[in-house]
């Protein structure tokens, strides 16, 4: 047990603030997920020395450090009983920018949209674009290997990471970047922890049987959104392990590692030129989800910048939302699904021609009943509606909420219609009507069952639905996490998804990087149970709370939680 005196002594060694009052611990007990664990303390480190002090303290006291940026993670990555290390206050600087090379080095607390505001005058931007882009931070995006609505054109965060600087679990500085095979081998001969990490990776992945097991059990190579466990399959592309690439970059392994291997202090990103200035959205309306998914396979033969789905549940949520109801201007009738296809070009005329060709193709194949073309400022209104989807779902009236547990599955695009058909059968079995939305063009729909996690019977369903969906994803060779990460909700299913042999490989990699389990324990390996440490006390008799303001529209203030 770490007493108050030891925390007071720790504070004396730090430049940043260390807080361990009940209020701050409660504030940091949750993230955007369904989980809750009371941390030992919260710290706002000011510099690298603070982080080294924290690593030493955690090692000596056998506790964990939980990295946290904006806390927008949906799977519980920022939840733990150790010290929450919040980089959003002080690690917020742009460290270097090279316009000609199109690279930028930033600290992990830089907000994604603020980064792009800085880059806009130079005609550049960072492509991955999450629905939380106005508040999510690059450190979290790297930790989760985030994607967003533009991944079919600009890729995922891992594609853009060139270098990660940080601290290892012994407090030493490290830089992971692109190396030749010979440079990698030289690293394996070093006696430091860094050298031991390189040696461990080399020894593990050089074995033919290990490579074959990875290739046979990991998600299909055609699935670009793949965050199940550590990305060891990414390293096999190097000629060091018989692949076609002449270089290898361990920073790619760190992308999606959820802060469990290294504490990142600086990230170097590759940038893209801005999207062509003229865009047109084709908002195709469909009478069924299945029809929309078949249309997606066809539409992806066109050069699309985005292909996003909203289902009837999402659309109905916006009907009674004062802010979003005005953005429903393009909706005709009562569609079961709307697909938003984005095409772009240097001129509006060319973009309209691309849109017309897409509509012609859809109509020829009898897909959809209404295909309005959206241009100009109306595009932002439409995407505001899509971006609001997640927030509106979280504020459904009553205790039943659209729960994030199976919302991140990704399969091969050609498998998507059949996968969703079988998934719907699972939902029907449990008398569930799931929510379907987001990244159809990338083979990933955010599928959410609607559950009341304050009731034991729905907590039981929470596990059953997640378990059966995991098995279905495995059947199709998919990824159980496409962009939101494993966190708590999916980590215990990693052995099912990649096989026990590969899971033990991940445990050995974690051990090589972090032998004392300092960084974010309970995530990816040796995971917390997915149906424990939930936000709510199950089957509690809810008290009636009298309020001055009227919350009757939401069935009382507690139903807003």
Go through the PLM ranges and name each one.
Residues 363-373, 469-485, 515-518:
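Flexible helix-coil linker/hinge segments at domain or subdomain boundaries
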Residues 10, 33-65, 83, 87-132, ...:
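N-terminal glycine-rich flavin-associated loop
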Residues 1-56, 60, 70-104, 131, ...:
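N-terminal flexible segment immediately upstream of the FAD-binding catalytic core
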Residues 33, 141-143, 151-154, 161-385, ...:
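C-terminal substrate-binding/cap subdomain adjacent to the FAD-binding core in PCMH-type
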Residues 65-67, 74, 115, 282, ...:
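Extended, hydrophobic alpha-helical segments in both membrane/secreted and soluble proteins
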Residues 475-479, 487, 492-496, 500-561:
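Ferredoxin-type iron-sulfur electron-transfer modules and their immediate structural context
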Residues 3, 50-53, 114, 291-294, ...:
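Short, conserved charged micro-motifs
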Residues 37-41, 279-284, 335-345, 399-409, ...:
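Short, hydrophobic beta-strand segments
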